[in-house]
Amino acid sequence: MASELAMTAELPTSPLAIEYVNDFDLMKFEVKKEPAEAERLCHRLPAGSLSSTPLSTPCSSVPSSPSFCAPSPGGQPSAGPTAAPLGSKPQLEELYWMSGYQHHLNPEALNLTPEDAVEALIGAPHHHHHHHQSYESFRPQPFGGEELPPAAHHHNAHHHHHHHHLRLEERFSDDQLVSMSVRELNRQLRGFSKEEVIRLKQKRRTLKNRGYAQSCRYKRVQQRHILENEKCQLQSQVEQLKQEVSRLAKERDLYKEKYEKLAARGFPRETSPPAAPKTTAADFFM
């Protein structure tokens, strides 16, 4: 029976499947005895079913498991687009279902022991393309036709708006925004939203104010340097004038001292000239 199972249902021998199966100890499960009716229920398919999955056992409320029973001799595979082929290989998720719900399987209906199941899993031939398909089935599926939640829509819209906002700001450099006239800027901003235009104009106003403040600061610093240079020149001139004043004061003191010395020696006074004799009228007539 194990060989027939290995032939009809080839299972992948990928390291992932082997490691997952080895994590479970199949020897600790006991074989549950079921009546022969369970075997008939295992082989019986529901009417109008497109899958090969049989009905679950009457005593179990677990959903129907993947089919590990041989199909009935008279059964014909369905020709629908979703119908699985008769000899199709079970997917890797069936292994996960089998390992997770081992206590719901019917070993008596399968006529298998835990050792036979392990041998069938390990001894199956390896197919690279089938392993790739089985592994791809466990990858997270995209949303597809499902509707995205409002948070995702908001995040996508915010990301798109942020990206569009960055593209608008990257379109103009700071120098272009400052040097561009208002008419030219309005012509360039045609077609953009009002919010983005206001934000860009606010950025331009901020840049112009910053440039004006830097210009005022530069002029103030330049004027300070000019005033400091003038101050230094005036201070040097004052020092020169002070030196000239001190030199003139010394020269004045020297001349004053000479004058005082000459005045102390006492120069002789000049005698007055003699007075002319008085002529009388008699002398005049004589």
Swiss-Prot record:
Q: Which GO terms describe its biological process?
A: insulin secretion; response to glucose
Entry superkingdom:
Eukaryota
Name its cellular compartments: Nucleus
* Keyword Transmembrane helix (UniProt): no
Q: What is the effect of changing residue 53 to A?
A: Reduced phosphorylation. Loss of phosphorylation, loss of ubiquitination, decreased transcription activation activity, decreased PCAF-binding and decreased induction of lens differentiation
Matching entries from Gene3D superfamilies are given as: 1.20.5.170
Mutation: residue 57 to A; reported impact is: Reduced phosphorylation. Loss of phosphorylation, loss of ubiquitination, decreased transcription activation activity, decreased PCAF-binding and decreased induction of lens differentiation
Role noted for this protein: Transcription factor involved in transcription regulation during lens development, including that of crystallin genes. Binds to CRE-type MARE 5'-TGCTGACGTCAGCA-3' and TRE-type MARE 5'-TGCTGACTCAGCA-3' DNA sequences.
Name-wise, this protein is Transcription factor MafA
Q: Which organism is it from?
A: Coturnix japonica (Japanese quail)
